[in-house]
Amino acid sequence: MSTLALPHTPGCLVCGRDNPHGLHLNLEVDPDTGIVQVQFTPTPNHIGFQGIVHGGIIGTVIDEAMVWAATWNGKRFCLCGEMTVRFRNPAKISRPIFCTASVDFSQPRLISTNAMMRDEHNTIIAAASGKYVPLDRERNREFVATVLDDVDQENQVAAMLRAAV
């Protein structure tokens, strides 16, 4: 699977490089399938209880993967309208976890997604589904101009979204 790196928004909690409290993750998309993937190794800062990753961190990473899957598919930035996460097994601190997300179906005003998070032994940590709402064209332009930190990145996103499946 050949992938493309997805752009970063400077202050984003998940991918932002300028957020001192952020996760600084690198998300990628397979341009042929629209499947988004991300790897994350939680640190002791992400503990919820006795060496287990906090469920909110798991949900946050899953949401980021699903919103990018919806954005790639819908060719516009999307916002989460609803997300359901089913936690199956605990994620352990300092052990890599992998998340993939894809689109189930897409309509002009609603994109349905799913995601799976697994550990390095392929054990399911969480499964999720979400409903994402694409921004209208004007708000999408404003969003792109506001959150992206430079013209080159803005042009990269515009080209990526034009090429999206």
Label for each model-derived stretch:
Residues 1-5, 91-93, 104-165:
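HotDog/MaoC-like acyl-thioester-processing domains
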Residues 65-98:
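Hydrophobic beta-strand-centered segment that forms part of the acyl-chain substrate-binding groove
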Residues 8, 21-23, 34-36, 79-83, ...:
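A generic structural signal for short beta-strands and their flanking turns/coil linkers
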Residues 37-61:
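A conserved, well-ordered hydrophobic junction motif at loop->secondary-structure transitions
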Residues 39-41, 84-86, 100-102, 116, ...:
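Residue-level recognition of well-ordered beta-strand positions that form the cores
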Residues 1-44, 144, 148-165:
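Non-catalytic linker/capping segments at the edges of enzyme domains
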Residues 28-30, 102-106:
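Short beta-strand micro-motifs enriched in acidic
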Residues 34, 75, 122-123:
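Detector for glycine-centered tight turns/loop "hinges" at secondary-structure junctions
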